[in-house]
Amino acid sequence: MRRRTIFFYICTLNAQLMVKAFKPYDIQFVGLKIGHHEFAYDIDSTFFEAFDYAEFNDAALKAHVFLDKKTTILDFKFEVSGLVNVNCDVTNETFDLSVQGQFELVVNFGEEFNDDNESILILPHGSFEMNVAQYIFELIVLSIPAKREHPGIKDGTLNSDILSKLEELNPNNSRYDQDHEVDPRWEGLKNLLTDN
């Protein structure tokens, strides 16, 4: 029984910390006048820690949320730019990766909450605020390329032991061909392909 109480306390404490971490991202749209509004946020590694996301070593980003409030709908435009420090997928060397992205969201009001469509959000009538932290988080994460490659690999300025070893083991490398004899059975199979 005591373990359950401690577990419940820890879960409650974590939930309270998350709510506190995301509180600055609440936009209370009820008190705003009809028209354009802008909200700016500085995003660092603590933002990603609140989401329990550990893909970035560090982050220095700016997020801008533009709200165009109309009588029946809210038009949001999210823009993110800055740098995240990540590990290269090839060499595991750290580097700063430039991030830029934008996303538009239309918020409408209805009987119940519905976020089935990625660009339309329906909030229940009577809602007075909206938290934009999840949208900023997803925009940043989805703006990162699938393969994170150190820029020094492309321009040849990166000196890395891993990169040297990969180059040495490259089968297209002539040095590799000299060091490794080809089994004569494979040569016979190659001849079958070229005899046609």
For every predicted segment, state its role:
Residues 6-90:
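A positional/architectural concept
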Residues 53, 89-96, 142, 194:
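Short, intrinsically disordered, mixed-charge
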Residues 79, 100, 145:
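Surface loops and adjacent helix of pleckstrin homology
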Residues 85, 93-94, 186-191:
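Basic (Lys/Arg-enriched) interaction patch that binds polyanionic ligands
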Residues 87-116:
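Helix-adjacent hinge/juxtasegments
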